Swiss-Prot record:
It comes from Salmonella typhimurium (strain LT2 / SGSC1412 / ATCC 700720). GO terms for cellular component: cytoplasm. Residues 1-114 are annotated as: Phosphoribosyl-AMP cyclohydrolase. This is Histidine biosynthesis bifunctional protein HisIE. It is an enzyme of class 3 (hydrolase). GO terms for molecular function: ATP binding; phosphoribosyl-AMP cyclohydrolase activity; phosphoribosyl-ATP diphosphatase activity. Residues 115-203 are annotated as: Phosphoribosyl-ATP pyrophosphohydrolase. In the N-terminal section; belongs to the PRA-CH family. In the C-terminal section; belongs to the PRA-PH family.
Length: 203
């Protein structure tokens, strides 16, 4: 969240008391929507943990999802370099747009969004009927079997590379990635955990 110093340095005068707030998906990086906050909306956002704007139409504070239940759970808030715009990282509950899409900017999705959506699907498969899909059956077979599949797909990926078969390498790498995501979900981990760890190693 914002530090006390960051909050004091926000330039409300420059924005006539209404500061643009860009909301971005905390996991996928997709830009979800743009709204405007006054100091009271920012305070309520921080206190409640749900993104709250000042509605220029309704002339009142408006918490995203207050009617639909599709709230935006705040992960972090950061000002830009001029202290006149906010970047809000949030995890959405349901679609963000009133039209039913994940973003108010249509289908111009971030490529990472597909992996996030795939992870969500895999998480649902964990508790599904084992007869309903290949993935649900794989979860039911247990961690050892899932780990074995990751090993098998890893070997097949490596073999495809050694014979310079780019088509087969792409297919095998896709299978490897899929089964690796299944294994991570099985262990209550996700791709974000891995990415965060890679960032730490890079620093």
């Amino acid at each position: 969240m914002l530090t006390e110093q960051q909050r004091r340095e926000l330039d409300w005068e420059k924005t006539d008391g209404l500061m643009p707030a860009i909301v971005q998906h905390a996991v996928s990086g997709e830009v979800l929507m743009l709204g405007y906050m006054n100091p009271q909306a920012l305070d309520k956002t921080i206190e409640s943990g749900h993104v709250t704007f000042f509605s220029r139409t309704k002339q009142r504070l408006w918490t995203k999802g207050e009617t639909s239940g599709h709230v935006l759970n705040v992960v972090s808030i950061a000002p830009d370099c001029d202290n006149d715009t906010l970047l809000v990282l949030a995890n959405p509950v349901g679609p963000t747009c009133h039209k039913g899409t994940s973003s108010c900017f249509g289908d111009a999705s971030h490529q990472w969004l597909f992996l996030y959506q795939l992870e969500q699907l895999l998480a649902e498969r964990k508790t599904a009927d084992p007869t309903s899909s290949y993935t649900a059956k794989l979860y039911a077979s247990g961690t050892k079997r899932i780990a074995q599949k990751v090993g098998e797909e890893g070997v097949e990926t490596a073999l495809a590379a050694t014979v310079n078969d780019r088509f087969e390498l792409t297919n095998e790498a896709s299978d490897l990635m899929y089964h690796l995501l299944v294994l991570l979900q099985d262990q209550d981990l996700n791709l974000t955990t891995v990415i965060d760890n890679l960032r730490k190693r890079h620093q």
